[in-house]
Amino acid sequence: MSNLNLATLDISEHANLPTSSEVLFKAKADKKLSFESIAAAIGRNEVATAAIFYGQAKASEEDIAKLAQVLEIDHAHLESLLSGFPDRGKSVSFPPKDPLIYRLYEIVQNYGYAYKAVMNEKFGDGIMSAISFSTTVEKETDKDGNNWAVVTWRGKWYV
């Protein structure tokens, strides 16, 4: 895989990320691994794997062991960095400065009430969990050669 297609991290632009992020991203870049390949090696999906790198998801003991192996990071060191609880939501300023992250917020801003209305009609009054939750990102190319991002959110419904 070309190094141009690898997500890397300039920690100076992300002051609120945990120390584990710098360690994980450095190993990822050094080994030239994509989130797809790391996810396959640890048995998680790409977004869940990336969330661990950004300190937004808790790594299990199994995740830590597999990440240490695939990234060639000392297990005890990685365990000490990842054994705590994530400090979710702190890594992005509001409003977001990154255009892609801003567009994700914009989608919720523009369609949030529409999502809510349709979900309430389908499921009744309740909420979609962001804890019992999974998400995927797929690439779709149409007949004209245009690339489309397909983002799926799957959350348990609570009444």
UniProtKB/Swiss-Prot annotation:
**Which keywords fit this entry according to its UniProt record?**
Lyase
Which GO molecular function annotations are given, in alphabetical order?
A: cyanate hydratase activity; DNA binding
Return the EC number: 4.2.1.104
Disulphide-bonded residues: none
- Pfam families, A to Z: Cyanate_lyase
Q: What's one GO BP annotation on this UniProt entry? A: cyanate metabolic process
Q: Which reaction does it catalyse?
A: cyanate + hydrogencarbonate + 3 H(+) = NH4(+) + 2 CO2
Signal peptide coordinates = none
Top-rank taxon of the source lineage equals Eukaryota
Q: Active site: which residues? A: 103, 106, 129
Q: Provide the function of this protein.
A: Catalyzes the reaction of cyanate with bicarbonate to produce ammonia and carbon dioxide.
* Similarity field: Belongs to the cyanase family.
Q: Identify this protein by name.
A: Cyanate hydratase
Q: Which organism is it from?
A: Blastomyces gilchristii (strain SLH14081) (Blastomyces dermatitidis)
Q: What is the lineage of its organism?
A: Eukaryota, Fungi, Dikarya, Ascomycota, Pezizomycotina
